[in-house]
């Protein structure tokens, strides 16, 4: 389990930093694509990707904003959906989702979660696709404390069961309960929050 706080970014040189960040992301995605390989395990699971020490040093520049996950499927898995859940006005809302049919045994996804938005990358042997959710409508700016948790170990995938990948919570209370990624984030007391979840289904989705 990883628990962390949010540090407000320094606005000086923000434009140059955005260009550097984009270049680093492109390099990381190319490396992730090359490193994506077949796995002989038959059980379905998702886990944090393993990278070399040099690549981990590059990832550290993103200040815990991005995480790569390796996924293994079996023949029962037909489709997947990744959803963005946002807490506002006392309720959790599904603000966005991306779904597709599964045509490969292994894959990799990357999630970049910031205080204001979320980017999702799906990566396989054919390349990568980016999905952007540029606005997260939840009042983190009103929170006195922000923390979160994300997958830090191998987690089994069960068909048609939602798996939280990354949860970030804000609170105005004097203390915050320690979260585990297996907890139901919807039961957490908070004033702001965003969660990224994965659901694998045994039914194909309609192509659009």
Predicted features, each with a name:
Residues 99-208:
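Extracytoplasmic electrostatic interaction patches
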């Amino acid at each position: 389990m990883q628990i962390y706080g949010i540090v407000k970014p320094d606005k000086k040189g923000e434009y140059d930093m955005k260009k550097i960040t984009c270049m680093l992301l492109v390099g990381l995605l190319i490396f992730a694509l090359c490193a994506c390989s077949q796995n002989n395990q038959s059980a379905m699971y998702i886990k944090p990707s393993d990278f070399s020490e040099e690549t981990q040093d590059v990832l550290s520049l993103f200040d815990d904003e991005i995480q790569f996950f390796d996924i293994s499927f079996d023949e029962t898995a037909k489709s997947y959906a990744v959803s963005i859940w946002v807490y506002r006005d006392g309720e959790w809302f599904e603000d966005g989702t991306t779904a597709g049919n599964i045509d490969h045994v292994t894959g990799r996804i990357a999630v970049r979660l910031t205080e204001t938005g979320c980017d999702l990358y799906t990566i396989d042997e054919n390349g990568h696709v980016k999905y952007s959710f540029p606005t997260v409508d939840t009042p983190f700016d009103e929170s006195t404390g922000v923390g979160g948790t994300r997958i830090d170990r191998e987690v089994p995938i069960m068909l048609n069961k939602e798996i939280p990948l990354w949860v970030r919570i804000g609170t105005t209370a004097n203390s915050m309960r320690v979260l585990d990624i297996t907890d139901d984030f919807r039961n957490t007391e908070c004033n702001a929050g965003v969660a990224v979840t994965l659901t694998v289904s045994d039914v194909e989705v309609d192509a659009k």
